[in-house]
Curated annotation (Swiss-Prot):
EC class (word): translocase
Subunit structure comment from the entry: The sodium/potassium-transporting ATPase is composed of a catalytic alpha subunit, an auxiliary non-catalytic beta subunit and an additional regulatory subunit.
EC number(s) given by UniProt: 7.2.2.13
Region named Disordered: 1-39, 217-238
Transmembrane segments: 91-111, 135-155, 292-311, 324-341, 777-796, 807-827, 848-870, 923-942, 956-974, 990-1010
Function: This is the catalytic component of the active enzyme, which catalyzes the hydrolysis of ATP coupled with the exchange of sodium and potassium ions across the plasma membrane. This action creates the electrochemical gradient of sodium and potassium ions, providing the energy for active transport of various nutrients.
Protein name in UniProt: Sodium/potassium-transporting ATPase subunit alpha-1
UniProt-recorded Gene Ontology molecular function terms: ATP binding; ATP hydrolysis activity; metal ion binding; P-type sodium:potassium-exchanging transporter activity
Organism of this sequence: Catostomus commersonii (White sucker)
Residue intervals annotated with topology Extracellular: 112-134, 312-323, 797-806, 871-922, 975-989
Assigned protein family: Belongs to the cation transport ATPase (P-type) (TC 3.A.3) family. Type IIC subfamily.
Post-translational modification Phosphoserine, affected residues: 16, 947
Keyword line: ATP-binding, Cell membrane, Ion transport, Magnesium, Membrane, Metal-binding, Nucleotide-binding, Phosphoprotein, Potassium, Potassium transport, Sodium, Sodium transport, Sodium/potassium transport, Translocase, Transmembrane, Transmembrane helix, Transport
Region (Interaction with phosphoinositide-3 kinase): 85-87
Amino acid sequence: MGVGDGRDQYELAAMSEQSGKKKSKNKKEKKEKDMDELKKEVDLDDHKLSLEELHHKYGTDLSKGLSNSRAEEILARDGPNALTPPPTTPEWVKFCKQMFGGFSMLLWTGAVLCFLAYGILAAMEDEPANDNLYLGVVLSAVVIITGCFSYYQDAKSSKIMDSFKNLVPQQALVVRDGEKKQINAEEVVIGDLVEVKGGDRIPADLRIISSHGCKVDNSSLTGESEPQTRSPDFSNDNPLETKNIAFFSTNCVEGTARGIVISTGDRTVMGRIATLASGLEVGRTPISIEIEHFIHIITGVAVFLGVSFLLLSLVLGYSWLEAVIFLIGIIVANVPEGLLATVTVCLTLTAKRMAKKNCLVKNLEAVETLGSTSTICSDKTGTLTQNRMTVAHMWFDNQIHEADTTENQSGTSFDRSSDTWASLARIAGLCNRAVFLAEQIDVPILKRDVAGDASESALLKCIELCCGSVKEMREKFTKVAEIPFNSTNKYQLSVHKIPSGGKESQHLLVMKGAPERILDRCATIMIQGKEQLLDDEIKESFQNAYLELGGLGERVLGFCHFYLPDEQFPEGFQFDADDVNFPTENLCFVGLMSMIDPPRAAVPDAVGKCRSAGIKVIMVTGDHPITAKAIAKGVGIISEGNETVEDIAARLNIPVNEVNPRDAKACVVHGGDLKDLSCEQLDDILKYHTEIVFARTSPQQKLIIVEGCQRTGAIVAVTGDGVNDSPALKKADIGVAMGIAGSDVSKQAADMILLDDNFASIVTGVEEGRLIFDNLKKSIAYTLTSNIPEITPFLFFIIANIPLPLGTVTILCIDLGTDMLPAISLAYEAAESDIMKRQPRNPKTDKLVNERLISIAYGQIGMIQALAGFFTYFVILAENGFLPPRLLGIRMNWDDKYINDLEDSYGQQWTYEQRKIVEFTCHTAFFTSIVIVQWADLIICKTRRNSVFQQGMKNKILIFGLFEETALAAFLSYCPGMDVALRMYPLKPNWWFCAFPYSLLIFIYDEIRKLILRRNPGGWMERETYY
């Protein structure tokens, strides 16, 4: 296999077999890379190859590297080692989406129709009325203002790739033609021989060929918090788990390594995640689907009414032009002009309220999505847990002791009086390379930053808390020799000089490491400060303790020591750590210490609240199944008494395959098994198990899990903080990133950021989301109701030929004036009592606007409001001499400018000017009547099920809204000059009271309806009227 085969081979390695067949022939094909391909597991085989095979595959000399000329050829062939930026949406397109999307389109249609109607009138008459022109201008202004507002609020942009750019290391050290040289990381090519050292970012995916104590931090990729050892050994079939592959853009924490580049740029594992995250089609938010559904209903009603009356007016003998003007009038009267602004303001208010509770919302519509969430897929590390390893248990003196893992050290403490504990603490402090960073004297011990790996940091903090300064301990026992931890012997050892006055020895050897390895090196054990022989009974006791702590998902370390005899190791003896010249066998075992990343304090309560709100919480983690299961039990994701298949098998003492999976409510799925599951099998797991943990998952699998949940009809929220979470965050209905620990990439992909990294904040978000949905329903019910008293005058004007009871300008004053603040005030309404006790809404059946809401608003309350308006209208005209029978069919003469002697019911003659003043006074009175009946409507819309008396009148904004709409109506009626500007005339005080009985009727009618609802849950009234 010669050098020339390289291209085919590494394509296969980086992209999996299928994509190897479909080589990217040109840029277009490269862009349309099959997303399903990216979702598959990384299919590398380079970690299985011997060094000889590697040399053949890549044509690289393992000591001299590639030649410069060969590297240039490969660079020309493959392009730079960089991530391809995704196509971004230009800002003007985003602006246009706000201007012409969804609800705005309805208003634009209304505006265009108004201009059209004005144009028709202008062509027909010399002095056309300006009403339609005003209406068109106002509608356009409403859309433009709210569009700009939304655009500024919604600054969610596709910066995902920008933050990936920050992950690209700037420089790389390569060996070419036998010489080491620093080059720009973008120039690294497949087959390059690269050297990395502690502190470097890895410039591409490498196959390690030699290493020296090398550890890498893979947390941004796999979610594992512990640094991972890297060596030339092939240790696992899974390329993400094996020790001989280091990944692009992860960090080398310590040691050095040399490796051959096996993939660059978009073909690296990180590149695949980047392409996956930026290429995912993001679904629409539930609220945008709801608003579209609502627009369809409103448009449907408007067009149906418009066309019906167009035909009716033609039958009644009106001309075509008049009929079209009527059609336009009816359609425009149906458009709730103020609703777009109301919805935007409601969402913004909630977003601000959530920001105060540590939830930063990037996308306004995401506010509501969280409320409809039915499944939360949560990352473990840092979200459910504190993201700091902490000593949880010790085993010494033949018993397990529990340490305090609470964040504020408020838990129980163990007995520290034993001499064995003193020895154990000394070993943990001395055989430990972690140190506190400088200048942190005032910082509490648990919050201090440490240089060193997670386990050693946990030991350092534990000993500092329990025994005082570790630094002083180390100064007292000076270190004279050390063997650092390595993966072959799995222990770390150091020799220390005992301060003068030591017992029979001047030197103490201390060792820690994998418990079984440490125990094998011991002949005695310390119990109550005294050494005794290690017999089978104690070994069994050790084994039980080790299994118990391991079963809790904890990382267990063993500790032993040995006093080196003076006759063999006198003062000044030269200890040699390379060619070991001191004993490492027959030591004295002291004890075990186990560490875990403990759950956050508020999480169990939050998980409980999710459960009572009908939300399923699934844990998805890159960590080990045992640890994941232990934390899941600790926080209540797996509740007490619920068993997995393995638990049932252990209890009944039968093989796992004999247990019926449906008997187990809980289940822990290993990423390795998930790979082999079909979509149907995954769907079954998600459907039939109520409590699920996915462990050892890869980024692609997180995405597959989210898609599985969505297939089963769930609305999914995903929390995460690593780069590995970004595809899932982007795909979820709502992605929630961590503000403190989260990587830039995850924050860009998410819709919401938890500023305090606390899972409990999500529950607050869910409550706020449900509340906004409820309150938007109430707001829409309130706004739509006044549509009926706005439309019916127009219909009677056409059918009964009466003078127009309500003009276009007055309709605008209601929709954009008096109704605005009350509708927005409903966003401040407190939650009804059952908000976190009910199941998540079903997006298919529980709509924002459903038939029942339309029936209540239009068919019931709206009709009573229309009666109130007509009652006032007929009262005023009757007082002026026109009794109802006289009004029928009078319209043609009434609107004729040249008739100045029209007789009323009593024979008085009216000029055109006088008639119009009475007509405009009627418009004003009809308008004030709507305001008065809207008082009752606003109060009944406060609740959907509870009585207003139960809910109370605590919403100050709503009370202010009631006064504001009344004051505005009075101002428009009585302010001098309004008769010219808006054709609104002052009213007699008694005309205000005509609508009061109707307002009272609305209130009583609705209170009785809600009483029946509460008395007969699920009954006819609920089925027909509960919206």
